[in-house]
From Swiss-Prot:
A lipid is attached at C18 (S-diacylglycerol cysteine). GO terms for biological process: peptidoglycan turnover; proteolysis. This is Probable endopeptidase NlpC homolog. It comes from the Bacteria. Belongs to the peptidase C40 family. The active site is at C95, H143, H155. Residues 1-17 form the signal peptide. Its EC number is 3.4.-.-. The lineage of its organism: Bacteria, Pseudomonadati, Pseudomonadota, Gammaproteobacteria, Pasteurellales. It comes from Haemophilus influenzae (strain ATCC 51907 / DSM 11121 / KW20 / Rd). Residues 65-183 form the NlpC/P60 domain. It is found in: Cell membrane. Gene3D superfamilies: endopeptidase domain like (from Nostoc punctiforme).
Length: 183
């Protein structure tokens, strides 16, 4: 009986853990000398209605999206690292640990380890007020990322690992719950 209860609890935790959004982002290394153009990372797939297959679309790199070289450096260092619940290393990391690492390395701010604690930091702000470095929360505050500008955020998702996504994507727009400014 106890074993069955533990299995059910484990499944519930997995179901509410960091998000598993649709795969719409390609991974690429970003030059620290360039402004980062992340809309190209998000919007570089186009569906062929005839075949239903997505293919890459050429995009320009002119949008100054994430000029902060420290954020670019953290992204480049962690991009593609797989998601691992409770993970804190390059072998696997979860969303709250990735925020903890990012804020420590980029802003010198020590965040608590869990999303449950992070969701109470700083002050709540409207989505329209988002600035680079704000925390964005999803799925009843069980998933967290850092806003990087141009309606995009950096996070660790179960499906893609460390990646960049757009708040405009259906999944993220539907599951967005709040934003918080801690700086």
């Amino acid at each position: 009986m106890l074993k069955r209860i533990l299995v059910i609890i484990g499944l519930a935790v997995l179901a509410t853990a960091c998000s598993n959004a649709p795969r719409t982002v390609s991974h690429q290394v970003i030059s620290e000398n360039d402004d980062i153009q992340l809309t190209g990372l998000i919007n570089n797939l186009e569906k062929d209605n005839r075949t239903g297959i997505f293919h890459k679309v050429r995009t320009n790199r002119s949008s100054a999206l994430m000029g902060d070289k420290a954020l670019a450096s953290v992204y480049n260092e962690w991009v593609g690292t797989r998601y691992r619940m409770g993970g804190t290393t390059k072998r696997g990391i979860d969303c709250s640990a990735f925020m903890q690492t990012t804020f420590s390395e980029v802003f010198g701010i020590e965040l608590p380890r869990s999303t449950a604690e992070q969701r109470h930091l700083g002050r709540k702000i409207n989505k329209s007020e988002l600035k680079k470095g704000d925390l964005v929360f999803f799925r009843k505050n069980n998933h967290v990322g850092v806003y990087i500008g141009n309606n995009q955020f950096m996070h660790a998702s179960t499906g893609q690992g460390v990646t960049i996504s757009s708040l405009d994507e259906k999944y993220w727009a539907r599951t967005y719950t709040q934003s918080r400014r801690i700086m």
